[in-house]
């Protein structure tokens, strides 16, 4: 295993939800084509509960898990936000503190 360093090649995981599989696949295809993410995992069937404008909402969504680097995260977030149908999409960045050396090397090589 490799300890990730605090650098531009450090890996991060970006979480984003989409309203349906078609939207999630379109967003994933866009960020992969632009080499802003190395991998997108789409998990349909997520249920999100939240308050929006004072009302409790419940939505069935697709959870997107995107793998990228610190140096690509801002461009990835901007791309997702500009192409996302939600007014305020879920965009969360989680640091990767450990990972398999071969996987992290592949991740870095897969990005622009």
From Swiss-Prot:
Places the protein is found: Cytoplasm
Main location, first listed in the record: cytoplasm
Keyword Cell cycle among record annotations: no
GO MF, any single term: metal ion binding
Species of provenance: Escherichia coli (strain K12)
Domain of life: Bacteria
Names of required cofactors: Cu cation
GO cellular component: cytoplasm; protein-containing complex
Keyword list, A-Z: Copper, Cytoplasm, Metal-binding
Record function comment: Involved in resistance toward heavy metals.
Assembly behavior: Homotrimer.
Family to which the UniProt record says this protein belongs: Belongs to the CutA family.
Matching InterPro entries: CutA_Enterobact, Ion_tolerance_CutA, N-reg_PII-like_a/b, N-reg_PII/ATP_PRibTrfase_C
Name recorded for this polypeptide: Divalent-cation tolerance protein CutA
Annotated SUPFAM superfamilies: GlnB-like
UniProt cofactor note: Binds 1 copper ion per subunit.
Gene this chain is encoded by: cutA
Binding sites annotated in the UniProt record for Cu cation: 16, 83-84
One GO term of the biological process aspect: response to copper ion
Tagged with keyword Metal-binding: yes
